[in-house]
Amino acid sequence: YGIKLSEPQEEVHINATINGTAVDGASLEKAVEKSGVAVDAVTSLTINSGKVTQEDLAYLKSISRLETFEMNVGDNLQLIGMDGQPTTVLSKDTAVIEFAPKRAGSSRADMTTLTLGGITEIYNGGLKAYDSIETIHMPDVVTVGASAFGLGAWLETLDLSSAKTIGANAFNGCKRLESLTMNAVETLGEGSFKYTDALDSLTLPATIKNIEDIRFGICKNGNKSGAKITILATTPPTVDSAAFTGVSSVTRPATVTVPQGALAAYVAQVNPKADVAKVLKRQDINWNSLYLREEGSSLVEYKAKCGTWADQYAYVATGQTITADKLAALHKDDQKNLKENEELKGWNTKKDGSGDMV
């Protein structure tokens, strides 16, 4: 009697979920084969554990109809770089994630959603053929290199929760970008927001220290008049004077809202002699082309009919009335204008004068 030997078992290097079904395989290609899903029918791919090799990355770009891709590098999943060692860096010299180009007859490729956890650095060339992607989650990236996302023509949502450094031109050309999450950023590089036409609302965290000439106001189409910026830092960052040029117009001024109690520090960058406890001139609250607002305060405007250059402003804690000393300061500072323009009698709750006098 002979003894039947068992068939040799395929070595498992990767576990992946393909169109909702989890499979093991010696490689990404073998895992797709075992799933029973034809390669041109794969629309969703999550790599759960194992090792992603250069061969796997080369195969990835052959999945022509892929729409969603997720990979979370960490204890259970390694990304093997070009040098054969594990890496958390995407660049043309370490590891490149490249997707399939658009199919013949299509206006764009199929990929729309990308999640890459555990990646700590991304540089130009680290992602390829990603221009069709609408949503990118890279929550662990700390360093974003120059022009890293410059080809994101369809990119609408970008999560860079842990990023500290944003390189020059990092988002240049992301004209559809509407939502950008940066909870730890310290430096924004030159040109990083050029041609981000749809991004008219931005929150910068308490960690922000340096804003270079990011060219936030430069658009290919339209403009960002009326943009709303929020800065959570109580200490004002260093800002290049041209960083927000072009975001404000006479009728639609762009604003920057700062934390309660931080207004004086921001105004001091503009005019060290200005006193936020009193009435301020228009130029005093123009912080790098953005008009200052303070969390927890309301801005009371004194509209001068002789021109916006003569407008004056007071910040009043929300729910409180304007104090007599601020009114006195207004009349003292605006004496000349009051004599020249009889319409300027005092404060009114409406710009056209039809409201109540304060």
Where are the predicted features?
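Secondary-structure capping and domain/repeat boundary segments
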Residues: Y1-P8, R293-V358
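Acidic Gly/Asp/Thr-rich repetitive segments characteristic of extracellular carbohydrate-active
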Residues: T17-A41
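Short, surface-exposed polybasic-and-hydrophobic patches located at secondary-structure transitions
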Residues: D56-R65, G226, S354-V358
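Leucine-rich solenoid repeat scaffolds
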Residues: G2, E7, D213-E295
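A structural signal for leucine-rich repeat
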Residues: Y59-S62, M82-S91, F99, A104-S106, ...
